[in-house]
Amino acid sequence: MNILNVVRRFEFQLFLVNVIIALFFYFENSAYFSSNNITTIFQYLAEIGIIAIGEAMLMLCGEIDLSPPALANFVPLITLTIYNSIYQAISPTPAIVVSILLSLGLASLIGLMNGLITTKAKVNSLITTVGTLFLFNGIALIYSGGYPESFPYFRFLGGTVSILPVPFIWSLGALVFLILLLHYTKIGVWTIAAGSNPTGASEVGVPVDRVKIINFIIMANIGALVGIIQGSRVLTIGATNFTADVVLEGIAAAVIGGTSLVGGKGSLVGAFLGSVFISELLNGFNILGINAYEFDAILGGAIVVVMVLSYYAKRASYKLKSIATATSSSPEGKDRITKILKFKIQKIYRRVEENE
């Protein structure tokens, strides 16, 4: 890849926008680049960034999940309960590992439920996960009585290394893992195919429902991890730690980063850079004394602009494919399109197998 191709990439352009924003806030207030403020930016970026890349994966296959805040509130309560039940029987460190793994297993079951309702019962994922959001937020409130719980045993997950918060390091690890999953495994191939053309992908052997369920499970685990990591940082957990704002900002970051809401197109790096964009604005506005309401208005405006541009880009793409669409109405046209799609998927399979 030459320099010109790099410059043309949307991710590079978004990176430059983030640099310009950071420099603007620095010239407005030099405290913006202080070590304490950088740590603050990274702390918020860690949470929204993990959610953004998870949502980007799910949006790539044409679905969306609004339930992570509920899982971030509910699952850590279960983690703490398991830890308190077993730490005396085994030493504290193994108890931490076991409690996290078991609670992530619970999160996986919730993700499986979201996936099955969406794919098998044919309920729109937006409706499914709004229901899950209210369901598990309610359970968390009942379970905790509405009171916060102390969460001191997991503090190492939320500490700092120099000016870098440990949660930010976790977010980078999640980004690398999902990039490898998307670009170098069959699950990644299936994810893109399912979002691009679910009917055609199914005809050439892609297990569309299965890959969507897998991505719902991944998203549920991400929501749970965000709750555990944030609880480790502030040393308390509860049913009101997270609101729907965090997932909406994560989705906004994914959209700003170039991920299409209708599936098949997107970038995990772009989603993470979108998280940087939102984190910089939120922190910079706070330093400049701009209130949160104005931030919400500006963020909403940015999302509307991106969505309008995305709509016209999609419309232009449909026009370019009009000939193929017209020919697909005949049996010969359908066979030809199916063969082309099958060839492309098999080509990607070969690339994945070579990397394995």
Curated annotation (Swiss-Prot):
Pfam families: BPD_transp_2. Induction: Up-regulated in the presence of D-xylose, L-arabinose and D-arabinose. Part of the ABC transporter complex XylFGH involved in the uptake of xylose and arabinose. Responsible for the translocation of the substrate across the membrane. One of its GO terms (cellular component) is plasma membrane. Disruption phenotype: Deletion of the gene results in a growth defect on D-xylose and L-arabinose. The lineage of its organism: Archaea, Thermoproteota, Thermoprotei, Sulfolobales, Sulfolobaceae. It is found in: Cell membrane. It comes from the Archaea. The keyword Membrane applies. Its main location: membrane. This is Xylose/arabinose import permease protein XylH. Disulfide bonds: none annotated. The keyword Membrane applies. The complex is composed of two ATP-binding proteins (XylG), two transmembrane proteins (XylH) and a solute-binding protein (XylF). Belongs to the binding-protein-dependent transport system permease family. It is a multi-pass membrane protein. Keywords: Cell membrane, Membrane, Sugar transport, Transmembrane, Transmembrane helix, Transport. It comes from Sulfolobus acidocaldarius (strain ATCC 33909 / DSM 639 / JCM 8929 / NBRC 15157 / NCIMB 11770). The chain crosses the membrane at residues 14-34, 41-61, 70-90, 96-116, 126-146, 161-181, 211-231, 242-262, 266-286, 287-307. One of its GO terms (molecular function) is transmembrane transporter activity.
